Design a protein with these regions (language model features):
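Short beta-strand/loop segments at the ligand-binding rim of alpha/beta enzyme cores
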Residues: 41-48
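A solvent-exposed, charged loop/short amphipathic helix patch at secondary-structure junctions
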Residues: 1-25
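Short, glycine/polar-rich helix-capping loops at beta-to-alpha or helix-loop-helix junctions
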Residues: 50, 58-72
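Generic structural signal for well-ordered alpha-helices
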Residues: 31-38, 94
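Two-component system phosphotransfer/interaction surface
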Residues: 85-98
Length: 175
């Protein structure tokens, strides 16, 4: 996110690297590091968060590649994404995992995104169906509709669960 200027020129300084040196971190660092962790530790739980994950938690327009990309949880092959500040959700996740709960059951936490192929356990009154990834990549109107629904559901006190199908036959629940 911090590597390029608005005109897509590479920055020589990196405020988030020790000493401010540029060119120390890869582009799309969350994706790269998650994939490396998955390769080194195939059975480990991969949790992602921070500014990059928060901004890309749902399907989004990617300025660098000039296209709509899937949620970063898909590209990073992560198990759970925590968005926003995350100070509360990280404690809840740590306590749940420490108690022996499998990460696939951490679907009840506010401020998280998880992948699933089954939304049957969700109460229809508790979620909003976003246009599918397929729809938003082919229709600007559907992209705008999805963005509006996301925007109207950012307040964690009143927001509903946002469900987005990657394709019409493959469900992903973005919370």
């Amino acid at each position: 996110v911090n590597h390029y200027t608005v005109s897509k020129k590479r920055r020589h300084k990196d405020s988030y690297t020790s000493g401010g040196e540029g060119f120390k971190r890869p582009d799309r660092a969350v994706i790269v590091y998650s994939q490396m962790a998955r390769q080194a530790f195939p059975d480990a739980n991969i949790l992602i968060g921070g500014i990059e994950a928060s901004l890309r938690r749902l399907a989004h327009y990617d300025y660098w590649s000039d296209k709509v990309r899937k949620s970063i949880i898909i590209d990073a092959n992560a198990d759970l994404l925590m968005f926003g500040m995350g100070e509360n959700s990280i404690i809840e996740v740590a306590e749940a995992l420490d108690s022996g709960l499998d990460i696939k059951y951490l679907t009840y936490l506010d401020g998280t995104v998880y992948k699933t192929k089954n939304i049957d356990d969700l109460n229809e009154a508790d979620y909003i169906m976003l246009p599918s990834y397929e729809e938003i990549t082919t229709s600007k109107r559907k992209y705008a509709e999805s963005f509006q629904k996301q925007y109207l559901n950012t307040d964690h006190y009143n927001a509903k669960i946002l469900v987005c199908l990657l394709y019409t036959s493959d469900a992903a629940d973005d919370r």
